[in-house]
């Protein structure tokens, strides 16, 4: 089943795609520290995080002690508080509970970063990837909590090693005549979050599909549920969360995975 497919990335590898932390291109010190912490998180803790937010996980990783250079340690002393911009509607990676506390997979990783480095985080809420990137570019934040790399974003941002792996999927309405493959969407509307790494692929491989970009994945799912789009594309981990929610569970379904590229 789809619910078993959430898998934490091997933090020791520089994998090409996946949800990552992102920093300004001119902030390599912070990036190096984050990568060092991700690489040193023990297997047991990674396993715990994965199982907390999914039905299970298959993780084969090695434990390593955190080793920071003298320069990185000095940088931490000079920057004890970091402004972290988070998408407040990006469950199960980042969302806020009824008490206003940050929750999700990425929230757990931020807590491990805090415990291992002493970093303190000032949270900045956002509702879209574009806004989060803009806050980094304008130096109003230091770190994006969860973002997918793309060629456009990599012009101004540096990405940590990915911490979550997952495929892109096609969401459709629960209907007998719903499309089962993107090829069946020619001339129809496909909703996708603005800035998604899948946008260029879809335009290249399926030029007759009418892409409708939304500010976030929730917006894309809403367009689909309301009948204003015929499909929506997102990563599997987010699709799982959406279709298990009370809002969409009786309306939407995961139809198929899209190509071999990893979303997270």
Residue positions per predicted region:
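Short loop->beta-strand "edge-of-pocket" segments that line small-molecule binding or catalytic clefts
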Residues: 77-88, 103, 182-196, 210
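A ligand-binding cleft/hinge motif common to bilobed small-molecule-binding domains
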Residues: 1-15, 130-134, 146-156, 201-204, ...
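A short beta-strand structural signal in non-transmembrane regions
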Residues: 18-24, 262-264
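N-terminal hydrophobic or amphipathic helices and topogenic motifs
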Residues: 6-7, 11-17, 26-140, 149-158, ...
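Flexible hinge/capping segments at coil-to-helix
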Residues: 161-163, 172-190
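Ligand-binding cleft/hinge of the Venus flytrap
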Residues: 1-4, 94-98, 107-120, 160, ...
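Short beta-strand-to-loop elements that line the ligand-binding cleft
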Residues: 10, 120-128, 192, 209-220
């Amino acid at each position: 089943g789809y619910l078993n497919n959430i898998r934490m990335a091997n933090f020791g590898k520089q994998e090409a795609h996946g949800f990552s932390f992102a920093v300004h291109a001119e902030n390599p010190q912070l990036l190096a520290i984050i990568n060092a912490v991700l690489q040193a998180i023990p297997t047991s803790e990674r396993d715990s995080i994965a199982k907390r937010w999914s039905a299970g996980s298959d993780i084969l990783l090695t434990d390593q002690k955190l080793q920071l250079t003298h320069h990185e340690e000095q940088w931490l002393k000079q920057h004890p508080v970091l402004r972290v911009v988070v998408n407040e509607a990006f469950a199960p990676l980042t969302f806020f509970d009824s008490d206003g506390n940050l929750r999700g997979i990425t929230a757990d990783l931020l807590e491990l970063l805090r415990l291992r480095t002493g970093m303190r985080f000032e949270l900045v809420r956002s509702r879209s990837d574009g806004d989060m990137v803009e806050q980094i570019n304008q130096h109003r934040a230091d770190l994006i909590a969860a973002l997918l790399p793309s060629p456009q974003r990599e012009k101004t941002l540096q990405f940590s090693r990915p911490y979550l792996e997952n495929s892109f999927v096609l969401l459709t309405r629960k209907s007998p005549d719903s499309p089962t493959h993107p090829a069946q969407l020619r001339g129809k509307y496909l909703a996708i979050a603005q800035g998604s790494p899948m946008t260029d692929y879809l335009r290249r491989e399926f030029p007759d599909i009418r892409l409708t970009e939304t500010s976030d994945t929730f917006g894309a799912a809403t367009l689909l549920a309301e009948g204003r789009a015929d499909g929506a594309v997102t990563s599997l981990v987010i699709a799982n969360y959406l279709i298990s929610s009370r809002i969409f569970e009786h309306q939407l379904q995961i139809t198929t995975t899209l190509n071999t590229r990893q979303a997270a």
